[in-house]
Amino acid sequence: MKIYILWFISIMKFVIGRKRFLLISPPFLKKQLWYDKKSNQSFIIYIRNLTDWYTNWQVFLEDQFSLSFLTNNLSKVSKEEEINDYYNQITKNGYKPLIIDCGSNNGASSIYFSLTYPKSKIISLEIDESNYLQSLKNLKSNRLEIVILNQGVASEDGYGNFIDPGLGNNAYRVEKNSGSKDVSLISITSIIKNISFKEKVTPFLVKIDIEGGEKELFSKNKDWIKDFPLLIAELHDWLLPAQTTSLNFLKTISEQNRDFVYRGENIFSISNQFPKIYPIDKT
């Protein structure tokens, strides 16, 4: 009953102009039809269970990656405007803004970024095979040219242990372990240098939701951070108390010339000195 109430409320908010996305299909259907007011496009997302439905609700109906909240400040130019201007500068220079989606789950976040930044190049990572296949299905259903890897992200390439805490398909974790071959891990640096791009790309955004893996990711090899003007991360001290999973991230970001803004479950880390636009160097 709760999801029907949420669905009805979301329709009312869309009608009065307060929401960007509209879920057209009733919640019980496995094939969900959506509409995006901003791009004037409809799209499809297949769901397996309630966990998928709530994931979509967070991404689209709560619009959790929106930058619109950054307009409420005292500066003449908002951070949202700066980021959008930088995105437009990249495309005007003939490059594609590179977005790396670490922890794509069912593909909803990658679809969101594709709709919001349609001229971008998106690399999506997901450790769980069932989530990876679901994500692949949803991306193909919308004919999106997004590269999706059945890998996890880490500070360096390697392998890790797959961990299912029993909290549903949006809570799978991986712990780096050289003796394990459960999950293949790839670093941000390797993604940038080793993946073959048909187009010229330049760093733009990294989204990180890796269920505590941020502790290892931000432990070393962090030079890539300065190249990405926008990081969006969900931290997980609440999920793994007394394990200081967010400590390395907080230490790293505090040393950078970046703003640090909380919204909902996510932290938005925004550069105060946007990097020079350049094509990624493969050497």
Model-derived features: positions:
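Phosphate/nucleotide-binding beta-alpha loop and adjacent structural elements of enzyme active sites
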Residues: 1-283
